[in-house]
Swiss-Prot record:
Species: Bacillus velezensis (strain DSM 23117 / BGSC 10A6 / LMG 26770 / FZB42) (Bacillus amyloliquefaciens subsp. plantarum)
UniProt keyword annotation of Transcription regulation present: yes
The entry's keywords: Activator, Histidine metabolism, RNA-binding, Transcription, Transcription regulation
Name of the protein: Hut operon positive regulatory protein
Source taxonomy: Bacteria, Bacillati, Bacillota, Bacilli, Bacillales
Gene responsible for this protein: hutP
Top-rank taxon, per record: Bacteria
Length: 148
């Protein structure tokens, strides 16, 4: 089980997320290379709304299937891992009087040299977290990777 140097799923999802220009070209290139891609934005004081927004966007864009449990479950774990980075391990937002404004990227595909390894999913989050008062937030980042 060797990672393919040019198919590191976490790295690719982070680069897609942070790339501020030529977004459509980058998505087209990833899709040509066999990746399924989703980008979006979410802001909330509730972590469950962040999770729901990522899941809904991933289903609408075809990154995961709407029916069945396995793909949603893998996405959930990757999203929770990314949220741990954003919230520094404290998965609470509104109850701690903090809010997030995030851009997200979801990438699905096989990062390994062997096709037998199957698909993996990566969720990258970047944006701000802080008190629900404009100007009192700071940057935050998180990434999560899980097998499907």
């Amino acid at each position: 089980m060797t990672l393919h140097k040019d198919r590191r799923i976490g790295r690719l999802s982070v680069l897609l997320l942070l790339h501020e220009t030529e977004e459509n070209q980058q998505i087209s290139r990833l899709e040509r290379d066999g990746w399924k891609v989703c980008l979006g934005r979410v802001g909330s004081m509730d972590a469950h709304k962040v999770v729901a927004a990522i899941e809904t966007a991933s289903k609408k864009s075809g990154v995961i299937q709407s029916e069945g449990y396995r793909e949603s479950h893998a996405l959930y774990h990757a999203t929770m891992e990314a949220l741990h980075g954003v919230t520094r391990g404290e998965m609470l937002l509104g109850s701690l009087l903090r809010t997030v404004g995030l851009k997200f990227a979801v990438l699905r595909g096989n990062p390994y040299e062997s096709e037998a390894e199957g698909d993996w999913i990566a969720v990258s989050l970047y944006g701000t977290i802080g008190a629900p008062i404009k100007g009192l937030e700071h940057e935050t980042f998180g990434v999560g990777i899980n097998h499907i």
